[in-house]
Amino acid sequence: MTQSTNFDDVYPVQWRDDQVILIDQTRLPLEYKEVAIADYEAMGHAIKSMVVRGAPAIGVAAAYGMYLGARRIQTTELREFVVQLEFVADQLRQTRPTAVNLFWAIDQMLNVAYHSGENVEQIKANLLSQAQQIQLDDLRTCQAIGAAGLEVLPREPHQLTILTHCNAGALATAGYGTAIGVIRAAWSAGRLARVYADETRPRLQGAKLTVWECVQAGIPVTLITDNMAAHCMQQQRIDAVVVGADRIARNGDIANKIGTYGLAVLAKMHAIPFFVAAPLSTVDFALDDGSQIPIEERDPVEIYQPEGNRITPEGAEFYNPAFDVTPASLITAIITEQGAIAPEKLADLQA
């Protein structure tokens, strides 16, 4: 049975009792289970196996993973400490290739190691503080994204039906959520009638996680299979689409969970606004466009053997990309903590 959990208390990554506590998202919604992580190897496995997932949450988890790795380093010599910490960073970078927040957070932690503290113990303390700050900043960022999203949602009808894909909620961030943050803000303002949640094959994050979050929050939610979205749009059941992003190129192309591109095409066809909600830390200004975003391919067992039950005969081949790229031309606006931005204006924000 699902443990009763208040939405406001859903924090997928926490620092508690000198270790990291993760909500095991592979067990939701049937079981609410927390997992204690005490070393960077365990954190790397948790990220790769999707115990923790969602680009911002992965970034927070990686930051704590860096501290866990630093804590275990025995040397007191600064140069050797940095060398060993860079090894930890390399191991964590290999866990998930698409979500840029992971790389951003690791770089933030390395920057602390390079430029703060006069001794190793001081650097270790600074690394823990930095990880905690990354977590706090992301929570505040998500709240700001929610407020910014509320401002750009369609004015009519007053109560909207919003379609979302995968899970860009509290479970995918430090808390509150990006796309679900916008939905939550709309619900609090009396502007939301209902959420339609794609199940999101093959991992079913929509069915398992987004629906779970909405139920916890008391938000009306309707689950649909991915191939029902076009019909729902044609029947005028959808007023707006709001999704998250795992990486955004400087031209406004975005990589998000597989199936997002198809939704954007459908939304364009039906003249439905398509919004992407993500923090600026998800923008990779080093990439000119979405063709340069690395796309993770996962074990095909996720396709042919969902929930441990094989559904496809032997002899077939499989293709299991975890993400696809949505061109900027299909996106109405990218909702960030600094407000909603037209995709073509994103490069103007580069520091």
Swiss-Prot record:
Cell cycle found in the keyword field: no
The organism's place on the tree of life at top rank: Bacteria
Residue positions of the active site: 246
Binding site for substrate: 53-55, 96, 205, 256-257
GO molecular function, one term: S-methyl-5-thioribose-1-phosphate isomerase activity
Keywords: Amino-acid biosynthesis, Isomerase, Methionine biosynthesis
Entry EC number(s): 5.3.1.23
Catalytic activity: 5-(methylsulfanyl)-alpha-D-ribose 1-phosphate = 5-(methylsulfanyl)-D-ribulose 1-phosphate
Pathway membership, UniProt: Amino-acid biosynthesis; L-methionine biosynthesis via salvage pathway; L-methionine from S-methyl-5-thio-alpha-D-ribose 1-phosphate: step 1/6
Enzyme class: isomerase
Feature type site, description Transition state stabilizer: 166
InterPro entries attached to this UniProt entry: IF-2B-related (IPR000649), IF-M1Pi (IPR005251), IF_2B-like_C (IPR042529), Initiation_fac_2B_a/b/d (IPR011559), M1Pi_N (IPR027363), NagB/RpiA_transferase-like (IPR037171)
GO-annotated biological processes: L-methionine salvage from methylthioadenosine
SUPFAM superfamilies, per the entry: NagB/RpiA/CoA transferase-like
Function: Catalyzes the interconversion of methylthioribose-1-phosphate (MTR-1-P) into methylthioribulose-1-phosphate (MTRu-1-P).
Family affiliation: Belongs to the eIF-2B alpha/beta/delta subunits family. MtnA subfamily.
PANTHER family: METHYLTHIORIBOSE-1-PHOSPHATE ISOMERASE (PTHR43475:SF1)
NCBIfam families assigned: eIF-2B_rel, PRK05720.1, salvage_mtnA
Name under which the protein is recorded: Methylthioribose-1-phosphate isomerase
Taxonomic lineage of the native organism: Bacteria, Bacillati, Cyanobacteriota, Cyanophyceae, Synechococcales
Gene field: mtnA
